């Protein structure tokens, strides 16, 4: 679900000091992202999120494709996941899988939605209304490139939900 496909695997046997044998598996991967991804820039975030998925601390679904496709962190992908689940609960017609695919196709829009959310709610400083308006204009401009009406509706509903949000605990750090 990270937007990659395994194209090769090389196992290596490692003999431990106690005589037991462990295995190291080296996987060759191919990116399936809809947009070019700079893996080197996203490597740390990807590795942290992969470990969290492996340990059951982060959901394993198609929103994780946005880590490489849109350069999001696992936490930012969780933000979009939460809005998608909320929309489904209040009567959204699109499945989570379809919403995930929409954002995988339009990764820049996913990134802009996260920026919009951060601009509106980040406690690190008040973002001007003009900056928020500019982000909304960028989103509207990107929507002109969305060919599918359903995809357009999904993105617009996310903008509506972010704008309807009054407060959030998203920025609370868990201990």
Task: Explain the meaning of each model-derived region.
Residues 1-175:
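Non-catalytic regulatory/linker segments of enzymes
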């Amino acid at each position: 679900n990270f937007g990659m496909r395994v194209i090769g695997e090389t196992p290596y046997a490692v003999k431990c000091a106690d005589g037991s044998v462990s295995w190291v598996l080296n996987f060759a991967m191919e990116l399936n992202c809809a947009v070019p991804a700079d893996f080197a820039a996203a490597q740390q975030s990807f590795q942290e999120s992969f470990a969290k998925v492996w340990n059951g601390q982060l959901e394993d679904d198609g929103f994780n494709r946005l880590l490489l496709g849109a350069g999001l962190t696992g936490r930012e992908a969780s933000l979009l996941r939460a809005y998608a689940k909320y929309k489904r609960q209040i009567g959204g017609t699109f499945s989570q899988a379809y919403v995930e695919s929409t954002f995988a196709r339009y990764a820049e829009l996913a990134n802009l939605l996260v920026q919009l959310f951060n601009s509106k709610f980040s406690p690190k400083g008040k973002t001007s209304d003009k900056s928020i308006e500019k982000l909304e204009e960028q989103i509207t401009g990107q929507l002109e490139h969305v060919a599918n009406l359903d995809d357009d509706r999904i993105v617009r509903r996310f903008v509506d939900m972010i704008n309807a949000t009054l407060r959030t605990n998203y920025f609370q750090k868990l201990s």
